[in-house]
Amino acid sequence: MNLYSALRAITDTPDATFLRTPQGRTLTYGDLAAGSARFANALVALGVRPGDRVAVQVEKSPEVALLYLACLRAGAVYLPLNTAYTLNELAYFIGDAQPRVVVCDPKVEAGVATLADAVVTLDAAGQGGLSDLAAKQAEAFDTVARDGADLAAILYTSGTTGRSKGAMLTHANLASNASTLVKAWRFSAADVLLHALPIFHIHGLFVALNVPLMAGAALLYLPKFDPDAVLRLLPEATVMMGVPTFYVRLLQDARLDAALVKGVRLFVSGSAPLLAETHQQWAAATGQAILERYGMTETGMNTSNPYEGPRVAGTVGPPLPDVSLRITDADTGRALPRGEIGMIEVKGPNVFAGYWRMPEKTAAEFRADGYFITGDLGLLDNDGYVHIVGRGKDLIITGGFNVYPKEVEEEIDALPGVIESAVIGLPHPDLGEGVTAVVAAAAEAGLKEAAILRLLTTRLAGFKRPKRVLFVDDLPRNAMGKVQKAALRDLHAGLYAAPASPRKDAG
């Protein structure tokens, strides 16, 4: 089953609008069929065969959507790459994935050509060698038959835990997750999704493209997140998907109010934790509750707060239909009762086929009964909602006690003047790890380290309280808004290092 064949609106409603840009450019579903056929024929002309990888590092444009669909139709494996990656980083991905063709921006073509044999270009305006070749091709293409277990895409993990791993996603993985979300979030052909996300990531690509494609919905397609453009277009939208940073920035604009978003039926947040404070502020400003969900590169979406029913701030909702989720002891795999923190494990048709060229790593990440070990810590409450506590790697063990960073962060974030915080463990000569808070605070608040430590004395047990508080203007984030705690740990690794003792002469 080729995923493209499940996107029935492309053939069933060719005159319906699929995509509109702020500049007024429009693509219908019929344009998708014709354009993706041209691009598929172009890929075949470049030597792409079923199962070949096509690496894509280009700026967002309507042509990228056509290229993605063309890869599906040609039976190729789509491999999107973050546009921020340097040539040095690209060398790893290209060397690992061995793509048949690399599609890149013309500005980096010369460098990429030193890494790959077949390189074609596509710029932010949708122009370049690939689009020129596609323009010469026929508007008909026989979509290649694929089995559900065949690979549709490889997405490399963000690398926050070390070397990036290529998550292999099948046609069945992507089709099942899109179908589940269409039902869970009540998508229909009447919807208009405001799309301001990048499309090299699972959120912007497989959630915010596949779901509307499967429902026959339309997109307001922005090249990137721009608050002015979003606020201007929100009255025309029925759904918006974003990362927490989007919502935080929109809340800073006085134009945001209930009247502006009266036509929007759903705001979705993901890719990074949404602060409960942001959830509450958004509801106060707009009268609507953001729907937070939980997913990852390897699985697509696993849980979602309900479309109908309470959307609980600080949770990511119950497991989606067809997804089995349990909380376990990380060492033994023993299932834990509700309310206890442990490792989140999931199983379902959404779960990936494994890591590209890493069979040992793949085997290590799955239990014998097929559950995938996510690496995320959390708990199930009595209502069946999942609470994410943090990454397992972020757990701090200080003096033999376990400290969950999110618990400490929530207390710090609640302090007046604090914008946000990240709590990390750093090597400590006495405790093993020292709890350390990195805080972004409002300049006018005049917060001091001693004041924060004093305020936390009545809020947290002594072993949970930070040994130090460090102030920064902004927390480092990756392209999807996740705080890069690994970078903070590397930067401050020597904070508690004991000064070298002067050597005493013998005698």
How does the language model describe each region?
Residues D15, Q137-Y156, R163, R186-V192:
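Conserved pre-ATP/AMP-binding loop-to-beta segment of ANL
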Residues R25, N41-N88, N402:
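Conserved AMP-binding/adenylate-forming
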Residues T26-G30, A152-S176:
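Conserved AMP-binding A3 loop
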Residues Y85, V102, G295, G348, ...:
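AMP-binding/adenylate-forming catalytic core of the ANL superfamily
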Residues K107-G148, A497, S501:
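ANL superfamily adenylate-forming
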Residues A175-V192, F200-V239, D253-R255:
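Conserved AMP-binding/adenylation subdomain of ANL enzymes
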Residues A237-G242, L251-R311, S324:
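Gly/Ser/Thr-rich phosphate-binding loop
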Residues R326-E345, A364, N382-D383, A445-E449, ...:
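Conserved beta-loop-beta connector loops within the AMP-binding
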